[in-house]
C-alpha cells in the first residue's frame, strides 16, 4: 500500500478500504478458497452422485427446456453458471459486504473504534 493509497482510503467513501482490498486481494483469495469449495462439490453425496454432477445434470435439462419452443415462449433463459465459480464469487461478495459494513461503522461511530490505532486514524474524521 502506498502513502497515496492510504490517504485515498482515509479521505474516501465509507467503503474505501474495503474496495482497496477487493482490488488487491480478490485474486489471491479466489486461489486460496477455490480448492476448499471444489472438494465438497465433487464429493459423493447420495448414490455416488456429487453436488457438481447434480448441478450439471440440472442445468443440461433446464437448458433443453429453455431452448425449446415452449421455453422460449415462456421467456425462460438458459443457465451458463459454473457452480464452483458462483459459490466462490458469492462467498467473497458476502465477506467483503461484511467488511464494508464494519468499515462504515468504524468511520461513522466513535464507539466502533475499539483500538488505539482506529481511534488515532479515524479520530479526526467526520
Where is each model-derived feature located?
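Short, residue-level hotspots on alpha-helical faces of the histone-fold
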Residues: 23, 27, 31, 35, ...
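A generic structural signal for ordered alpha-helices
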Residues: 7, 11, 15, 73, ...
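Short, charged low-complexity intrinsically disordered segments located at boundaries
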Residues: 21-26, 67-68, 122-126
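A cross-kingdom marker for long, charged
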Residues: 84, 90-126
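Mid-length scaffold segments of soluble, non-membrane domains
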Residues: 1-44
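An amphipathic alpha-helical core segment
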Residues: 36-92
